[in-house]
Amino acid sequence: MSEHNVYGAAQPAQPGQPAQPRTRIRTHHLQKMKAEGHKWAMLTAYDYSTARIFDEAGIPVLLVGDSAANVVYGYDTTVPVSIDELIPLVRGVVRGAPHALVVADLPFGSYEAGPAAALAAATRFMKEGGAHAVKLEGGERVAEQIAHLTAAGIPVMAHIGFTPQSVNSLGGFRVQGRGDAAEQTIADAIAVAEAGAFSVVMEMVPAELATQITGKLTIPTIGIGAGPNCDGQVLVWQDMAGMSSGKSARFVKRFADIGGELRRAATQYAHEVAAGVFPADEHCF
């Protein structure tokens, strides 16, 4: 099977038959990709317009991340963002992406109290936002929540290693799983898989350890700063496209300079308006 078709793109037409339309990516498609050795990309998305572009590009999974706290709302960390701030973003992404699996982050404070709190938060994202799955941070400590959500029919993406919501207790942005801590990271990965998570994000984990965990688990692993051997990779789209300000994390590669292009376009637009060049005759009725 070609990579193009694995992503749910239109199937080639047989002689005398129309092409088959793309289908919505589901969790079992990701499992099949892992089994067949196909790697896949995930990006964050926070609005209809970018979700539409990423969906057209064939990105199979879109994450409405709590990173919206930083890139949408301007908070310093992901801790302050609320469910009420995230649900409208999820709605827009779901409308813009008819083919991608849309995953919503459960924000800090919405699930730590226990399974009942996690179910209440996840249910809101599924019912009010239209999300197809939710993501929550933590390993063994949230296994009970993951099991409760999956038993209720809610697909869960886990997140281990560096967990941004715990930045204050982790002592800042630090690689996790080095040395003796590797065993705990492995235990976390096994715990979330056994609890029923359909995939697990591994953030800022040594590449060798991430490779080991990917080999141990039957569910897909998704790396962000976890080396090239995870089943999938994820980046915040503003980091990937050159929209973020300041120094990028080591694991980020900029694939474009969208920020620079927007600044140039806005500057040129303002200049032409001030000079009376825009609107020209061709823009008038």
Swiss-Prot record:
Composition bias type Low complexity, residue spans: 8-21
Amino acids binding 3-methyl-2-oxobutanoate: D66, S67, D105, K135
GO MF, any single term: 3-methyl-2-oxobutanoate hydroxymethyltransferase activity
> Where, subcellularly, is it found?
Cytoplasm
The entry sums up its family as follows:
Belongs to the PanB family.
Q: Briefly, what is this protein's role?
A: Catalyzes the reversible reaction in which hydroxymethyl group from 5,10-methylenetetrahydrofolate is transferred onto alpha-ketoisovalerate to form ketopantoate.
Q: What is this protein called?
A: 3-methyl-2-oxobutanoate hydroxymethyltransferase
Organism phylogeny: Bacteria, Bacillati, Actinomycetota, Actinomycetes, Mycobacteriales
